[in-house]
Design a protein with these regions (language model features):
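N-terminal topogenic module of multi-pass integral membrane proteins
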Residues: 7-10, 14-99, 221
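Short aromatic-rich membrane-water interface segments that cap or initiate transmembrane helices
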Residues: 33-37, 104-108, 112
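Alpha-helical transmembrane segments of polytopic membrane proteins
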Residues: 38-45, 77-78, 111-115, 165-171, ...
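Membrane-embedded alpha-helical transmembrane segments of multi-pass integral membrane proteins
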Residues: 47-54, 81-88, 118-125, 145-152, ...
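C-terminal ends of transmembrane helices
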Residues: 54-66, 122-132, 179-187
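Cytoplasm-facing juxtamembrane segments at the starts of transmembrane helices
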Residues: 65-80, 130-147, 162-166, 183-202
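Membrane-proximal helix-loop-helix units in multi-pass membrane proteins
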Residues: 108-175
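Terminal transmembrane helical module of multi-pass membrane proteins
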Residues: 159-223
Length: 223
């Protein structure tokens, strides 16, 4: 003979309610509003500052390289082109893959890859310079980053983004010269690398200005 068990009925009701809540949570999709504020100006400014500092010193030979100067250069290299690019790369890749806040801006994947990789390689170069260790192995590193620079140039050229394509043209020239400069101890190459770093740094500052004015003031600068 069956009888009404209020305790058991209460347990069943709690279980049913819990199951409904779990199913509702599983079905619920979290979405974030699309944002036009792509943070690439942060990476551009960081890299541009690094190129002014490292490129200017290599091009003009001022100040002369000493252990003290190299430590200062290493600190700037770690934080500006290193950390600011790495931060931008992680920001972009997270926004593209987890939260989809940048829409279908597919070339931004290339930007996220480049900012992350360049940022980490600046960490290594900055620390190498800070402790004043041998720079010759950087020539092998430059081969990989020459490939990455050519890849970025190709992607943004096909996307029709000429200003960013020009940045990757500068990067391609820098790493193409870096290879023989480091591996073959080509003395003139150091100043050529500094020259193209300095010129690319100026273009990066323009791109920083153009992006910031467009987003902050609704300007129409070419970028």
């Amino acid at each position: 003979m069956s009888y009404y068990n209020p305790v058991r009925r209460l347990e069943e009701a709690v279980q049913e309610g819990s199951l409904r809540r779990i199913k509702k949570m599983e079905a619920q999709a979290f979405s974030f509003a699309s944002s036009p504020f792509v943070p690439i100006a942060i990476g551009f400014f960081g890299l541009g500052t690094g190129y002014f500092i490292w490129g200017g010193q290599a091009l003009f030979k001022f100040p002369e390289s000493t252990p003290e100067v190299n430590r200062t250069m290493g600190l700037w290299g770690f934080w500006m082109p290193g950390f600011m690019q790495f931060l931008t790369g992680i920001y972009l890749l997270t926004g593209l893959t987890w939260f989809n806040v940048f829409g279908k801006a597919a070339p931004l994947y290339m930007a996220g890859l480049a900012f992350t990789a360049y940022g980490i390689h600046w960490f290594a170069m900055a620390y190498r310079r800070y402790i004043d260790s041998d720079a010759q192995p950087d020539g092998w590193m430059a081969i990989a980053f020459l490939f990455l620079s050519i890849l970025g140039m190709d992607v943004f050229c096909h996307a029709g983004d000429i200003p960013v394509t020009l940045i990757f043209v500068g990067l391609t020239l820098i790493y193409a010269i870096e290879i023989p400069t480091r591996l073959l101890s080509w003395n003139l190459g150091g100043r050529l690398v500094g020259f193209f770093q300095f010129v690319t740094g100026m273009w990066l500052m323009y791109c920083t200005y153009a992006i910031t004015v467009d987003l902050a003031l609704g300007g129409k600068a070419w970028v």
